């Protein structure tokens, strides 16, 4: 949430929902998607941390949700046409933050080991206080020598390598998300 809010200067014509950070269940996510469709949003982008989808029943519930929204939602009588897209990162969004600085395909056993690597490039704490003090995570990472362009390139590389090797860890589709935001 805080990271995407910090991108509003880069992508001026986007609306970020929800307005607060929240770990959302699949059922809650589905309700939020339906709410966005009813509000007439043309695009709904769902950012998914896959570390919470590694086990059942979450994995199956998530796959069903993706399948449900695989095609655009069209309700012509209501004037609704909405594309719902999912963008995954395994383990978590902080991998994309690390990609601001360097590439890795290392298998992380847990979030703490990933955060330790991120902290080698820029001090980072997963706290509301830190997010506020950083005055925007995107700018904070760039002030500390990272770059969004590098993050996008590294994320795209991780997805390409994932597909070639059939691995199911350490990848981020957030590069593709940034490219989609750029195209809107």
What is each of the regions a protein language model found here?
Residues 1-3:
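Short N-terminal binding/cap micro-motifs at the start of the first secondary-structure element
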Residues 5-20, 26, 30-43, 51-184:
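C-terminal accessory helical subdomains adjacent to catalytic cores in phosphodiester-
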């Amino acid at each position: 949430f805080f990271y995407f809010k910090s991108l509003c200067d880069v992508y001026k014509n986007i609306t970020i929902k929800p307005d607060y950070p929240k770990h959302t269940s699949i059922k809650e996510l589905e309700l939020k998607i339906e709410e966005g469709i009813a509000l007439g949003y043309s695009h709904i982008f769902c950012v998914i941390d896959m570390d919470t989808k590694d086990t059942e029943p979450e994995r199956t519930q998530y796959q069903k949700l993706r399948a449900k929204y695989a095609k655009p939602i069209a309700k012509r009588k209501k004037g609704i046409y909405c594309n719902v897209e999912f963008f995954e990162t395994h383990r978590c969004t902080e991998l994309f933050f690390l990609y601001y600085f360097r590439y890795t395909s290392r298998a992380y056993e847990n979030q703490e080991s990933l955060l330790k690597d991120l902290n080698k490039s820029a001090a980072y704490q997963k706290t509301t206080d830190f997010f506020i003090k950083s005055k925007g995570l995107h700018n904070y990472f760039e002030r500390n020598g990272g770059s969004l362009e590098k993050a996008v390139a590294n994320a795209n590389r991780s997805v390409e390598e994932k597909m070639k090797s059939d691995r199911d860890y350490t990848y981020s589709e957030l590069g593709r998300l940034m490219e989609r935001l750029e195209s809107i």
